[in-house]
């Protein structure tokens, strides 16, 4: 994902989706 892996988690995190990109 690269850059998207940093943007999507932020957008989806507010949507109730958890990501492990921390």
Curated annotation (Swiss-Prot):
It is found in: Plastid, Chloroplast thylakoid membrane. One of its GO terms (cellular component) is photosystem I. Belongs to the light-harvesting chlorophyll a/b-binding (LHC) protein family. GO terms for molecular function: chlorophyll binding; metal ion binding. Its main location: plastid. This is Chlorophyll a-b binding protein 3c, chloroplastic. It comes from Pisum sativum. It is a multi-pass membrane protein. The LHC complex consists of chlorophyll a-b binding proteins. Coiled coil: none annotated. Keywords: Chlorophyll, Chloroplast, Chromophore, Magnesium, Membrane, Metal-binding, Phosphoprotein, Photosynthesis, Photosystem I, Photosystem II, Plastid, Thylakoid. GO terms for biological process: photosynthesis. It comes from the Eukaryota. The N-terminus of the protein extends into the stroma where it is involved with adhesion of granal membranes and post-translational modifications; both are believed to mediate the distribution of excitation energy between photosystems I and II. Binds at least 14 chlorophylls (8 Chl-a and 6 Chl-b) and carotenoids such as lutein and neoxanthin. Photoregulated by reversible phosphorylation of its threonine residues. The keyword Cytoplasm does not apply. The light-harvesting complex (LHC) functions as a light receptor, it captures and delivers excitation energy to photosystems with which it is closely associated. May channel protons produced in the catalytic Mn center of water oxidation into the thylakoid lumen.
